[in-house]
């Protein structure tokens, strides 16, 4: 007792407290003193990977309903911020867009696109700004999209004729998904390579390549999240498959480049406004830039190949998936299909073809597509971004190097923004100025900000004309007298979320 009351010990107390303070400052991470977003418990090594599931957009929504619209997960050793509200999406894709404009490094995209030299996966910087500018100003400008209008019209006309022939030759149900996939491949191939390169053999190669790319882009690469496990790719076969697919894509595109270069040399073509008016294909435009005939722009050969492959993988998947889900929702909702039938056939009455002017008058068609993309955004989890610096979002501290995922699917079904969000009701968009351009963060099926989809106008042009022509020329019914609600709407897993089963229907050509 006397020892405890010794005055000399009291004199040491301030020194002791100072030592404790220094110890805490030295051995406590600064981030622990800052407010981080809420997180579910994680496991050693894998973090929260076990909670992702085969349909991540659904499992992440379930987690966000418990942990909030901005939550922090850990995929292996990588911190991953998940945004599941319009407010959080706005913070990331608008308020702090520049901080979140780069992409995380990906082994798969590096291998398939020559070190991520494409538009989708290229890190933010001078190179990305250059290729994005080429895409926006030369490949997918409004003028360019209009110049490809004849390709879209010709290919959709071919599809209608092929479906007609199939109906005449057989009364069995038609796999409509096969026809729309072939249509999308043909359109992309024609505008990318030119019609002469879209023969049966090349189309077969392209289809096989796209299937391989789609499958592998959805594969989990352990090395991206747990670096010391990268070696397992050799044993799982991922490295070998990547090498095969990269070679397959390279050989296909190199063959087309060589053919274009020979033709251009023979014809001594030069890049000018007249070429644009003729509707030059993407490869011609990119090779002109590669050869230095377009002032202010430059590309190497690998960049040309990466951008072209990007057009195929992103363009085909996005358009085909949007068409497929739109048809599925129409079959599930006969009232909506009947209303759309009426509009399309009234506007195009007495016409064999639907013009751009006709499409402009089809308001219900436009809201049907908008509603489909609300419920079924082609890429439900927008391609991941990465923070380039420490930043505060919605009161939470976010570290530099944090991956960021915006769950566009969850936001499009949030009852906070949408009345009866699970209901397919196109009328909710009537009279609304909400569109696809990424200005309304409760609705971003094609992303927003610097990383929004540059092919938006082109994709919507193809989807609109395809749906309008199918509805104009045919009546559809589910086989075996199945009820609309019996149509299987199960999703397939993947970066782009397709309908798992193809759309198979009875088709009857209408009198026009």
Curated annotation (Swiss-Prot):
EC code: 1.14.14.188
Protein's membrane topology: Single-pass membrane protein
Catalytic activities: norfluorocurarine + reduced [NADPH--hemoprotein reductase] + O2 = 18-hydroxynorfluorocurarine + oxidized [NADPH--hemoprotein reductase] + H2O + H(+)
SUPFAM superfamilies: Cytochrome P450 (SSF48264)
Residues holding heme: 453
Gene3D superfamilies assigned: Cytochrome P450
Pathway the protein takes part in: Alkaloid biosynthesis
Gene Ontology cellular-component annotations: membrane
Chief site of localization: membrane
Chain segments annotated as coiled-coil in the UniProt record: none
Keyword Plastid attached: no
UniProt keywords, alphabetically: Heme, Iron, Membrane, Metal-binding, Monooxygenase, Oxidoreductase, Transmembrane, Transmembrane helix
Keyword Transmembrane helix: yes
A GO term, aspect molecular function: heme binding
InterPro entries: Cyt_P450, Cyt_P450_CS, Cyt_P450_E_grp-I, Cyt_P450_sf
Cell location: Membrane
Requisite cofactors: heme
Origin: domain of life: Eukaryota
TM regions (residue ranges): 3-23
GO terms (BP aspect): alkaloid biosynthetic process
Similarity-based family: Belongs to the cytochrome P450 family.
Function: Monooxygenase involved in the biosynthesis of curare monoterpene indole alkaloids (MIAs), natural products such as diaboline, a pharmacologically active compound used to regulate blood pressure. Curare alkaloids act as animal glycine receptor antagonists. Catalyzes the conversion of norfluorocurarine to 18-OH norfluorocurarine.
Protein name per Swiss-Prot or TrEMBL: Norfluorocurarine oxidase
